[in-house]
């Protein structure tokens, strides 16, 4: 059974393997053992309530409960930008007009922004290519909503998610090549690595402070503003079906879109509910895939089951109960996996 659980120190080797498969562009999962070890330590200190809000971040892994193999990672930052500034470009408009000359130009413009400061962030979503089947991607992404619903007071009103922008297999980013490289004087991969390993001071020091007309960028760069990497398109679709929207904020490095939603408007959070769990053999029937999660903060578990999403009493097998770290009589959180049926 595939389950979501909190990260542990022993996961470092598995995370290094995952980091090596990202192909670059996933800033928060660099192939750097010291950085990943520090990330694990920060997550564990978050669970033990040892950190201020601006440093808190939860990390989860997707594990095969029978073999112990890890095939995916996902994370939540509690409040971004409270320690280091959190930058986006806001894609806006500047108008230049002259009645005398009968000229009117509305020009798309990039404005440096810290508007999402304090928001909670969904981040570091990566699934091993060999695990991209049987609903694993949905479980990995949406399990975070079950955790947020259970421990709502830990998170802020707005939730954001930076989506990976357009980068080719050689690490070439059209947006970076046309804009960022002119100010940072380094390749995209170098800037991405520095940011991913926590060396972010250079961003504030070298970022252009004035609005930038997108017409000054190459046509290739203009075309990728707000667009996602092909491998990220499914993740974007998942979030949009949960209520997330693109509000014209983009990543300063690759131009990928930032999606956002009020936390209480996220479908899986809004519609999830607590039901009593019993041990037994689930009744046969053509039931939809559902997310189920325990309410244990330190030993959180989430998985997929076939069930009636409207049931008041969820029957699970002994193996399912064991994987979810719960017992008969406990209450678990349940919600339909998708607004529309998704076969897994």
UniProtKB/Swiss-Prot annotation:
Keyword Acyltransferase in record: yes
GO terms of molecular function: arginine N-succinyltransferase activity
Domain of life: Bacteria
Residue sites binding succinyl-CoA per the record: 125
Annotated Gene3D superfamilies: 2.40.40.20, 3.40.630.30
Entry keywords, A to Z: Acyltransferase, Arginine metabolism, Transferase
Pfam families from the UniProt entry: AstA
Reaction catalyzed: succinyl-CoA + L-arginine = N(2)-succinyl-L-arginine + CoA + H(+)
Active-site residues (renumbered): 229
EC number: 2.3.1.109
GO process annotations (BP): arginine catabolic process to glutamate; arginine catabolic process to succinate
Pathway where it operates: Amino-acid degradation; L-arginine degradation via AST pathway; L-glutamate and succinate from L-arginine: step 1/5
UniProt keyword Acyltransferase, yes or no: yes
Chain's role: Catalyzes the transfer of succinyl-CoA to arginine to produce N(2)-succinylarginine.
Cited PANTHER family: ARGININE N-SUCCINYLTRANSFERASE, N-SUCCINYLARGININE DIHYDROLASE
Annotated family: Belongs to the arginine N-succinyltransferase family.
Name this polypeptide is given: Arginine N-succinyltransferase
Taxonomic path: Bacteria, Pseudomonadati, Pseudomonadota, Gammaproteobacteria, Enterobacterales
